[in-house]
Regions:
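Short juxtamembrane loops and helix-capping segments at transmembrane helix boundaries
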Residues: 45-53, 348-378
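Mid-to-C-terminal secondary-structure elements
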Residues: 119-135, 146-269
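Short, strongly hydrophobic transmembrane alpha-helices
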Residues: 8, 16-44
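C-terminal membrane-exit region of the final transmembrane helix in multipass inner-membrane proteins
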Residues: 5, 25, 376-416
């Protein structure tokens, strides 16, 4: 039966080329937009390489100081982090990092680069794929060695396609030696950078023991998925008498990537609000699907009306309304899946165009063209969206068809 439905679907598509083109256009554009949007969300919150431990990784990027009922938020300093959150019992390892930018001028071309100061533990928490060399280790961090791990994009810029290991390049007037080359992380990730160097080469480190404000973040890899233990231990460490003078209390904020996204999308910078985030994302997805679904419903109603004689003949030979509803819904789902596959293909080019468009606003610091990656999660979500769109746009016209008067249908008219 399904085989016959598939054959009939293609015959109808070829017979009604105008409606087929409109339907496929609406579906493919809808799925294209949904795919790009889903890919963006997936790159932010999912455990994609090199951040394979995102579910149990916390980013500590803010400290709140309370004094006389007033609150002051700041990015913590390296000295504050090293003094107060090292050797946590609930964590497997802790890494410190900060991101800066520097400009290079090569072969008449000016380019901006993202520079990340970090430590040896950064490479234990993440899982970067090294195409050349290796990461820097504890001794190199302790000694303040001017060594660097660079991305493939940075290698292509400074060294073309030649081997980069052992070669030097300038960063803010100082020469760094390349010891490793990695595939880039997502530009939407906290671990993204063009160049990674030991934090001990950072001349802007806050060295004062009492300094609280700075530019550094901490990445905490929990031993288990129970992140409440890490947060409880952090709260116990923030004993004001032993940490910071001249304030009443101190609070640090450490969240996973999902929680970071939830904070930003719910307009609450202190705590994640999943309910509000789900509402915001849900509204966006509904808007993406509702408008084209309404258009497809109208097209399907018209298309079914033009098949009135066919429907009348089938009814007169004993086909039930349920049989016809199943047929038309399956036809619509098949067409929707075809449009969805086209939409997935279009999303690849659309994402590249979007990146090029974004790069026009900042020609120095350009995003990689492969910033949007279609993972199996995105593919599965888009497949589900196709099925949902097919059902939404097909059930109502099919139900209307089931009420069609047989006599009107056989005369070539309809009472839809």
């Amino acid at each position: 039966m399904l085989k016959n439905y598939i054959k009939l679907t293609f015959k109808v598509m070829l017979r009604k080329k105008y409606y087929t083109a409109l339907t496929l256009l609406g579906i493919s554009l809808t799925i294209m937009v949904i795919t790009v949007f889903a890919s963006f969300i997936d790159q932010i919150i999912s455990a994609n390489p090199p951040e394979i431990n995102r579910e149990r990784t916390l980013i500590l990027d803010k400290v709140s100081l309370y004094k006389d009922g007033k609150k002051t938020d700041a990015i913590p300093s390296l000295s504050f982090l090293q003094k107060n959150i090292r050797n946590l019992q609930s964590t497997e390892t802790i890494s410190y990092f900060t991101s800066r930018e520097f400009i290079s001028f090569l072969n008449g071309k000016t380019t901006g680069h993202v520079l990340k100061f970090t430590d040896e533990n950064f490479w234990k928490i993440t899982d970067f794929e090294f195409t050349e060399g290796k990461a820097f280790h504890l001794n190199e961090v302790k000694n303040g060695a001017r060594v660097a791990v660079i991305s493939e994009k940075t290698k292509a810029y400074f060294f073309n396609e030649h081997d980069a290991l052992g070669k030097t390049f300038p960063i803010q007037g100082l020469r760094y030696t390349v010891i490793g080359v990695v595939k880039s992380a997502s530009p939407f990730s906290k671990v993204y950078s063009d160049v990674y160097v030991p934090y001990t080469t950072d001349i802007n480190i806050q060295l004062t023991d009492k300094a609280v404000e700075g530019t550094y973040n901490a990445m905490l890899l929990a031993k288990t998925n129970d992140l409440r233990k890490v947060r409880a231990e952090l709260r116990s460490r923030m004993n004001i008498k032993n940490t910071v003078s001249a304030v009443d209390s101190v609070k640090v904020h450490a969240f996973t990537s999902l929680e970071q996204f939830s904070k930003s999308s719910s307009f609450n910078d202190d705590e994640p609000e999943y309910g509000k985030t789900a509402i915001v994302v849900g509204i966006i997805l509904v808007l993406f699907m509702l408008i084209p679904a309404i258009s497809l419903v109208n097209i399907n109603v018209t298309r079914i009306g033009e098949r009135a004689e066919e429907i009348g003949v089938r009814k007169s030979f004993g086909a039930t309304s349920g049989n016809l509803v199943n047929q038309l819904v399956i036809e619509n789902i098949i067409i929707t899946l075809i449009g969805g596959l086209i939409g997935l293909g279009l999303s690849v080019y659309a994402s590249q165009l979007l990146v090029h468009f974004i790069n026009t606003f900042d020609p120095l610091f350009k995003m990689p063209t492969d910033s949007f990656i279609i993972s199996w999660r995105v593919f599965g979500f888009c497949l589900f969206s196709c099925l949902l769109l097919g059902l939404i746009s097909g059930v109502y016209p099919a139900w209307k068809m089931s009420r069609m008067n047989v006599i009107y249908a056989l005369k070539g008219g309809n009472n839809l």
